[in-house]
Design a protein with these regions (language model features):
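N-terminal glycine-/serine-/threonine-rich phosphate-binding loop
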Residues: 1-54
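Glycine-rich nucleotide/cofactor/substrate-binding loop typically near the N-terminus or early
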Residues: 36-107
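Active-site/ligand-binding-proximal alpha/beta "capping" segment
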Residues: 80-130, 134-136, 406-412
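Active-site loops and adjacent core secondary-structure elements that bind or stabilize anionic groups
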Residues: 150-364, 376-392, 414-423, 430-432
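Glycine- and Gly-Pro-enriched alpha-helical subdomains that act as flexible
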Residues: 287-307, 440-484
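Cysteine/selenocysteine-centered motifs that mediate thiol-based redox chemistry or coordinate metal-sulfur cofactors
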Residues: 315-316, 322-331, 464-503
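C-terminal binding/interaction regions
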Residues: 333-360, 485-527
Length: 527
């Protein structure tokens, strides 16, 4: 057990600190403090020793130097059971410090403010705080280090129950927690400065540095993971204010791991469209999608693609849910989630009758566009003993680069439909085949090991609507069998990347079948 006799308290987040310090004082602990923290404690009529008085050295450089002093760090780092250290402390008149209570400048919060300058961001980089935390944590066997206000109550309770002392287990736990906190803090600063002060010429490592760390902040614990026997939690990128973590749940029970996965897939698709759009997702694949001038019609068309698969699905919309749409949703059978930029109050009143439906609001902005090297987001997939890291697939279709390779040219209407289907194929598990009419899907074949099987499934889903539809494929056709099958079902046009060694044969087959074919030069595998 470690008896706490002297504590240094210097915090940015002053939540609960006065009551905590008062509790320490009642236990006979001497309090050292700095700046605003010392002021808050004095205002609470507590005896406080200013660090500058304790060290005999004033704060300087606009407060940049407060606690960087041997009398502070010597008192934290000295090994209590080492005679040489004890002797050095006596020679230099340095007292032991048994507890450090520090939390850091809110770098993340302050750098998210609109218009914050680099100079302002740099002034929010804490130096003294991490130094004290690390010194105390290095000597965790003898020094208690508290960096989280949520710990205050438990610390006081343990001190009261143990005559002002803390257990070895508590000190160990706190010491480890510090290095998690300081590493997160440093990584956040690194990410901000890399983004804002390095240009591409200076950033030698680019998106794939020698060592890659993740800086994630927990949003919530989840009931379980992909399956009930797996534990799970939802995290956001530190410093990120947009994305799924920003969604607001208006109604329904707690989101599951699979709900969030499917919501992500759904939102990524509707972000492809500027006109009103709706998408139904099941098991991370679209089972219906549509774009229309009217969001109500878009919803109807998306739902009609595959009503059986849509049961129990996730729906994303890029327009407000009004009362008319809410009435249609209420008649659509069981759905897990609806995510939309906005729900009106009367809409909420109607949809809350569906107890198992979750309603979520999220501003759905346009998807990032450009080339992968322009994307700041990394796509990370875990493998055994490591990870695969790549740019996010944000490459967009430039209609000027489309190449019609067949004698038959797609009509203007067919081209519009092909481009729509291509956007859906981009977000569908490979092998992906999308059949569309106008700007609505009529059949989707996803996740098959054989591309011709995906074509077959999409035609079965579309039924009579296959005739006159267009087809999008996320990757090239290795054989002409899929083209022959498409012709059998009277599909009129195909869009695909091209690039197969069998391209000439594929084109000849399309010509024989009277099918228009367009090459994009872009592949969108999704494993």
């Amino acid at each position: 057990m470690t008896k706490i006799k002297r504590a240094l308290i210097s915090v940015s987040d002053k939540t609960g600190v006065v009551d905590f310090a008062l509790g320490l004082h009642k236990l006979g602990v001497e309090i050292l403090s700095t700046g605003g923290t010392a002021k808050a404690l004095r205002e609470a009529k507590m005896p406080v020793i200013e660090v500058s008085d304790y060290t005999g050295f004033p704060e300087m450089l606009d407060g940049r130097v407060k606690t960087l002093h041997p009398k502070i760090h010597g008192g934290l780092l000295a090994l209590r059971d080492k005679p040489e250290h004890t002797q050095s402390l006596k020679e230099h008149n340095i007292g032991l410090i048994d507890m450090v209570v520090v939390n850091l400048y809110p770098f993340e919060k302050n750098t998210q403010k609109p218009g914050v300058s680099i100079e302002e961001a740099i002034e929010n980089i804490d130096i003294g705080g991490p130094s004290m935390l690390r010194s105390a944590a290095k000597n965790y066997r003898s020094v208690a280090v508290v960096c989280n206000p949520e710990r205050y109550a438990a610390v006081l309770e343990e001190l009261r129950n143990n005559n002002g002392a803390l257990s070895r287990e508590t000190l160990q736990e706190f010491g480890v927690e510090v290095f998690r906190e300081t590493s997160r803090y440093d990584h956040m600063i690194y990410g901000y400065l890399k983004k804002h002060i390095l240009d591409k010429a200076q950033d030698k490592e680019g998106a794939f540095p020698h060592c890659l760390g993740l800086n994630l902040v927990k949003v919530q614990d989840l009931r379980y993971g992909e399956n009930p026997h797996q534990k799970a939690a939802f995290y956001r990128d530190a410093g990120e204010t947009q994305g799924l973590a920003a969604m607001k749940q208006l109604w329904g029970k707690e989101l599951s791991f699979n709900n969030i996965l499917d919501l992500n897939a759904a939102v990524n698709i509707v972000r492809e469209f500027s006109l009103p759009a709706a998408v139904f997702i099941k098991h991370n694949n679209p089972c219906g999608a549509a774009q229309n001038q009217d969001i109500l019609k878009a919803y109807k068309q998306a739902w009609s693609c595959d009503r059986i698969s849509a049961f129990g699905g996730i729906v994303a919309l890029n327009r407000e849910v009004d009362l008319a749409l809410a009435r249609l949703i209420a008649k659509s059978g069981f759905l897990e989630c609806i995510i939309s930029p906005k729900f009106s109050l009367e809409t909420l009143g109607l949809l809350k009758d569906k107890k198992n439906l979750r309603l979520l609001e999220l501003p759905v902005g346009a998807a990032p566009r450009g080339r992968p090297e322009q994307c700041a987001t990394l796509d990370i997939k875990r493998v055994w003993g490591g990870a695969l890291v790549q740019d996010e697939d944000i490459l967009t279709l430039d209609e000027n680069n489309l190449k019609t390779v067949t004698k038959q040219k797609p009509s203007k209407k067919e081209m519009e439909s092909l481009i729509f289907a291509w956007k859906i194929a981009k977000h569908t598990k490979s092998n992906a085949i999308i059949l569309a009419k106008g700007t609505k899907t009529v059949g989707i074949g996803a996740g098959q090991m054989s591309r011709v099987d995906s074509v077959f499934i999409s035609t079965k889903k579309a039924g009579k609507l296959t005739a006159g539809s267009v087809l999008a494929s996320d990757a090239f056709f290795p054989k002409e069998d899929a083209i022959v099958l498409a012709a059998k079902y009277r599909i009129s046009a195909i869009i695909q990347p091209g690039g197969s060694i069998a391209d000439e044969q594929i084109i000849q087959t399309a010509d024989k079948c009277g099918i228009a074919m367009v090459f994009t030069g872009i592949r969108h595998f999704r494993h």
